[in-house]
Regions:
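Cell-envelope/ECM-targeting effectors and their regulatory/trafficking segments
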Residues: 1-89
Length: 89
């Protein structure tokens, strides 16, 4: 999980965001983070429709000011902070 956090942190620093159609290790790391937080999301390294639905649901609950299904810095930072606040973290 630490590797996933480092990968995502680097992506945030680079100003990256993730949307449907994106693939690769950073998407895989983000999927692992959503799964760790409790979302039923397979880790496939592909930002597909299912991942888009998870991101949208997450935003609807935790960031209702902007619900667009794009995993931007605000979405990723919120997820990271919520994971850090989990018991035992």
């Amino acid at each position: 999980m630490e590797r996933a956090r480092r990968t995502i942190a680097a992506a945030i620093r680079d100003g990256r965001f993730f949307a449907r159609g994106d693939t690769g290790q950073p998407v895989e790391a983000l999927q692992a983070m959503f799964a760790l937080y409790g979302y039923d999301l397979p880790v496939s390294a592909t930002f597909d429709a299912r991942m888009g639905a998870v991101v949208t649901a997450f935003q609807r609950h935790f960031r209702p000011a902007r619900i667009d299904g794009v995993a931007d810095a605000s979405t990723i930072t919120t997820l990271r902070d919520l994971i850090a606040a989990l018991p035992g973290r």
